[in-house]
Amino acid sequence: MEGNGERDTMMVEPPDSQEFAELWLRNLIVRDNSLWGKEEEIPDDLQEVPCDVLLSDMLQPQSSSSPPTSTVPVTSDYPGLLNFTLHFQESSGTKSVTCTYSPDLNKLFCQLAKTCPVLMAVSSSPPPGSVLRATAVYKRSEHVAEVVRRCPHHERSNDSSDGPAPPGHLLRVEGNSRAVYQEDGNTQAHSVVVPYEPPQVGSQSTTVLYNYMCNSSCMGGMNRRPILTIITLETQDGHLLGRRTFEVRVCACPGRDRKTEESNFKKQQEPKTSGKTLTKRSMKDPPSHPEASKKSKNSSSDDEIYTLQVRGKERYEFLKKINDGLELSDVVPPADQEKYRQKLLSKTCRKERDGAAGEPKRGKKRLVKEEKCDSD
């Protein structure tokens, strides 16, 4: 019987690999739990984290919460590794245009609630699930912490085009049912998010249609304060892939305002550049010959030809003689001019001497044949 018992114990099947691993891990956990009582009792060689704990941490799902946003938004451009860029459709400079973009000012001029197409391009495809976020912020530093929202008048107006957008949001997306309107929990800034869609066949950019639902001059809203629109390309977890910024003005006549601001911008740039060059020249090498410098400054105006209208032929002949004399003085060298002056002076002096010699010395009038004396 004893032999049979020994045989039975010998015939017990060994546990498979899965059961063996569970027993081994259970043994390790028991040992580790016995050592977690006091930290000073743990030997130095067991201070490291056990492998099963590391494996369990690695197998747990990571949280997909987006990183917290800062109070002051970043408005600088960041193309990123994907070379994220923005483009705008070319528009005519007429006053009747509803949306126009100025490359010199990096500014978009548009009317209230009108379609503003923005073209976005990347050099390579972003990760799946990427989104495009558009946020409006104030441009000046004293207003940057405030939330850009619609004025009370437009916010209370019942508009059928609002759709799912909250009434206080300035930025809207047109023609995209997947647009999501969000409010940041830290800064309360309003933003609208749409999924990134790859360009269609034959196109290199993705187009998003935006609407601005309040004028820049509305009291209680923007109140003539300039705003910026920040468009970011983000992953599904909220990590930044690229950022672009442009200024926006919502007005009644975008074409007129663009032309006015561009002309003012060019006028401001001209005196700055000319002033800089003049100061640099004066500081480096002051002119040794002021007369020569004056001539060089006026050389451009001296070469121009002007037309003067004169009434009356006598005046015309008189002014023509003056002009001819000035033209001759420009052609004749200064040394020859001095010779001609000496000749003219000698002629005038000779005439005066001849006239003085012909007259009587004592002041009596010389008689002519036809004239008679008073006594006669």
From Swiss-Prot:
Biased composition range(s): Basic and acidic residues: 150-159, 257-270, 282-294, 349-361
A GO term from the CC aspect: mitochondrion
Residues covered by region (Interaction with DNA): 249-256
Location of the region described as Basic (repression of DNA-binding) in the Swiss-Prot/TrEMBL record: 347-372
Matches recorded under InterPro entries: p53-like_TF_DNA-bd_sf, p53/RUNT-type_TF_DNA-bd_sf, p53_DNA-bd, p53_tetramer_sf, p53_tetrameristn, p53_tumour_suppressor
Compartments, as annotated in UniProt: Cytoplasm; Nucleus
Cofactor: Zn(2+)
Residues covered by region (Disordered): 150-171, 257-306, 342-376
Region Oligomerization, annotated ranges: 303-334
Disulfide pattern: none
PROSITE patterns named among the record's database cross-references: P53
Domain description: The N-terminal and C-terminal disordered regions undergo liquid-liquid phase separation (LLPS) following homotetramerization and activation. Post-translational modifications, such as phosphorylation or lactylation affect the ability to undergo LLPS.
Entry protein name: Cellular tumor antigen p53
Organism in which the protein naturally occurs: Ictalurus punctatus
UniProt lineage: Eukaryota, Metazoa, Chordata, Craniata, Vertebrata
Chain's gene name: tp53
